Amino acid sequence: MQDIQLDTLLSEDVTPENASQVMQALSQSLNEHNIRYYVDDAPSITDSEYDRLMQRLLKLEALYPHLIVADSPTQRVGGLALAKFDQITHLKPMLSLDNAFDEADFSAFHKRVTDKVGEVSFCCEPKLDGLAVSILYRHGVLERAATRGDGSVGEDITENVKTIKSIPLKLRGNDFPELVEVRGEAFMPKAAFEALNDRARAKDEKLFVNPRNAAAGSLRQLDSKITAARSLAFYAYALGVVEPDSHPLAKTHFEQLQQLKSWGLPISSEIKVCAELSQVYDYYKDILTRRSDLAFEIDGVVMKVNDIAQQQRLGFVAKSPRWAIAYKFPAQEEMTLLEGVDFQVGRTGAVTPVARLKPVFVGGVTVSNATLHNADEIARLGIKVGDTVIIRRAGDVIPQIVAIVPERRPETATDIVFPHNCPVCGSLVERLEGEAVARCSGGLFCEAQRKEAIKHFASRKALDIDGMGDKVVEQLIDKELVQSPADLFKLTASMMTMLDRMGMKSATNLAAAIEAAKTTTLARFLYALGIREVGEATAANLAAHFASLDALRVATVEQLTEVEDVGAVVAQHVAHFFAQPHNLEVIDALIAAGVHWPAIEAPSADAQPLKGQTWVLTGTLNQLNRNDAKAQLQALGAKVAGSVSKNTDCLVAGEAAGSKLAKAQELGVKVMDEDELLALLAANA
């Protein structure tokens, strides 16, 4: 914009006739100074002068509220807090990146790229440890912003994004497209993170563990005033959707980033184009060396093929572009003291040793505990309580003990002894031959496994108790209304009104759903029991093979291995489960409570025309539930797999079928649409 004299903006007389013009001039000036400060790093007025301009605009907007424009800098902080975040479907999927963890990984990626498109140069930039954000501008004005979410659907965080001062509410200049989507990373600089935790510490509030969590939590505040106080920052790293698509854009990724900067969007000052592979490695090493000195947390660098035409030729796989990769930094390591070991019991009964550590800051977070995995890992490390240990954050996420420092072992160091009995229920802890993990044999009886076991029992693919969500299960157990799956069927509507936010109508509906769930199938019942490594398909195969629960309960490991897709390990799990008295008591209680299923007739060869065939489902089915389609195909003898291969007999492609359809066509696999599937199922009903 052409500069307007500061004195003029501060002193011009304002009347109802010229108020709109003056307010627009003030907004335009303040937005330009924001860009000069946050993007160009070249402020042209002092902070006090900026504040005087802002105060004048605020006073005028108070006098003439009907003249407030959408891109006014005063509109960065919204009014009332939101009740919830709306969902936004991305105009173009926001994909994640594949990772390289060493030179061999990156070299393999480089070879894949050059084999397809020849020599390339890379646009390299730090991999910010924040939250991916999509920002949509229409006619240059910020219209909406969303999180990445699952890549297809994110959450509407428009009001919160507006509070980030480095993000322009209106783009600079006039050479931008009519509609442009900007993608980038919202993050919390280290200094802002430290200040945030200092304030929390002074108020005796819970501290954030790292800047990434702080940034994510700040962007997901329903009240944008809280976000505004968190001092978030943003760097743009890519263009998304551009309309019209004929709008002239730069031909390289680096030049497109410069276009974004010219429109007033901040980009990292560490971006560099590397024409040679040696330059890429030098860039990686340079950023790694300077990592701790940067103003923000990073966990690697991102390498993108610079030429846009080459990017388009390389294309995408299901979840990531073929032309970019995140080259991750090695995990950071620190030394600390092993003060003790606790043993935790998970849903499947796994007894896991957890190291209690003297707190140490490593990889951007304070670590006070780490998993020791199992007895084999303890033996491999030769670790004892009292040892000095080396902690690494693998992939900068999971803390783990990688070694001990033998020369620092005190005379008082003690062995780590695995418990013979479950620390929760007292049942025997057993370790099956060939397994590294020790497990509580209490199954559904063990209190530690109870919540997760009952959540699984009631879940959609198990007994499918409509309305029995995780929070309801947790309340039922916490209030001691339920101690085993069979107790679910003793619940009454009046009992369930004791739960939070559960009125009589909801309780009556849930009671009806519980009653309806008594009628199930043997396959669903077996899956609901939560037997280790027995998923839907295995449960269905067991039900079809044995036809009755009584036959399955007494089956030997040898008999179990005769079942399709059941190997020796799964057979051991099943036999072991039915050998535990506590588990049999729970099953008998469920039968006594009225859980039942229709008798299974052994299928004839004529009833299984798809026996021996492998089918795959992909895309959206409009007339048939995906699980129902899978079950009906299995009933006809088909094996339903999750991926397409040369062994696939048929792919059922619903709407928006993606990479699986392309692969099936490439391999010459038969493809069937939903109508053809329905016709097949109807013909064999």
UniProtKB/Swiss-Prot annotation:
Residues at the active site: 127 (n6-amp-lysine intermediate)
One annotated GO molecular function: metal ion binding
CDD domains for this protein: BRCT_DNA_ligase_like, LIGANc
Enzyme Commission code(s) on record: 6.5.1.2
UniProt keyword list: DNA damage, DNA repair, DNA replication, Ligase, Magnesium, Manganese, Metal-binding, NAD, Zinc
Domain called BRCT: residue spans: 605-685
Binding positions (Zn(2+)): 422, 425, 440, 446
Record-level GO cellular component terms: cytosol
Catalytic reaction list: NAD(+) + (deoxyribonucleotide)n-3'-hydroxyl + 5'-phospho-(deoxyribonucleotide)m = (deoxyribonucleotide)n+m + AMP + beta-nicotinamide D-nucleotide
Cofactor entry: Mg(2+); Mn(2+)
Amino-acid positions noted as binding NAD(+) in the UniProt annotation, renumbered to this chain: 47-51, 96-97, 125, 148, 185, 304, 328
Gene Ontology biological-process annotations: DNA repair; DNA replication
Domain of life from the UniProt record: Bacteria
Physiological role: DNA ligase that catalyzes the formation of phosphodiester linkages between 5'-phosphoryl and 3'-hydroxyl groups in double-stranded DNA using NAD as a coenzyme and as the energy source for the reaction. It is essential for DNA replication and repair of damaged DNA.
Family named by the database record: Belongs to the NAD-dependent DNA ligase family. LigA subfamily.
Alphabetical list of NCBIfam families matching this protein: dnlj, PRK07956.1
UniProt protein name: DNA ligase
Organism per entry: Shewanella baltica (strain OS195)
The organism's taxonomic lineage, starting at the top: Bacteria, Pseudomonadati, Pseudomonadota, Gammaproteobacteria, Alteromonadales
